[in-house]
Design a protein with these regions (language model features):
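Single-stranded nucleic acid-binding surfaces, predominantly the OB-fold ssDNA-binding core
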Residues: 33-37, 86, 127
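Short, acidic/charged, Gly/Pro-enriched secondary-structure junctions
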Residues: 66-106
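Intrinsically disordered/low-complexity terminal segments and short unstructured peptides
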Residues: 7, 15, 25, 77-80, ...
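C-terminal or internal capping secondary-structure element at the end of a domain, subdomain, or sheet
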Residues: 114-138
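Extended hydrophobic/Leu-rich segments
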Residues: 13, 68, 85-87, 125, ...
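Solvent-exposed edge beta-strands and adjacent loop segments
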Residues: 1-63, 99-122
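Acidic glycine-/aspartate-rich tracts in secreted/extracellular proteins
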Residues: 60-65, 129-132
Length: 139
């Protein structure tokens, strides 16, 4: 089993590389569970429904032009493309796959923290598409 330090994840939103502002990224691939339990069954049975994935990003707010907070504010209420790769700077492959998904920018936290902390945000975005998994391509 290969074990890796998770410090090289690459994250792009709307083709802008925001990796240098992200402190944590979590892509949760989830499907709705549809119950199909019938009379006579001895346990619940489920089948896959629609995909309902989420992307959670923890990042440092930055209001400069073309930076993350401005990018999100500009796209607030719209759907943009998010691209993630486990090891940025390394070719896309079976051991370094590319994940692409459309996310709805439906919530923002542009101001957060207290007098002694960094202005940062932790936001979960609703995915508006299935998560595409690729072993070829470019980040």
């Amino acid at each position: 089993m290969a074990v890796m330090l998770n410090s090289t994840v690459g994250v792009k939103l709307a083709s802008t590389d925001i990796s240098d502002h992200v402190s944590s990224a979590t892509l949760s691939q989830i499907f709705d569970e549809l119950e199909i339990t019938s009379l006579g069954d001895t346990s619940h049975k489920f089948t896959k429904g629609l995909e309902a994935s989420t992307l959670t990003l923890d990042f440092f707010n930055d209001f400069a032009a073309s930076q993350i907070t401005t990018l999100l504010q500009t796209n607030y209420g719209t759907t943009i493309t998010a691209v993630l790769i486990p090891v940025k700077g390394t070719a896309v492959s079976a051991t370094n796959p590319l994940y692409t998904v459309s996310i709805l920018i439906n919530n923002l936290t542009p101001i957060s923290g207290d007098v002694a902390s960094i202005n940062s945000s932790s936001i979960s975005f609703t995915c508006n598409s299935t998560v595409a998994y690729a072993t070829t391509g470019t980040f």
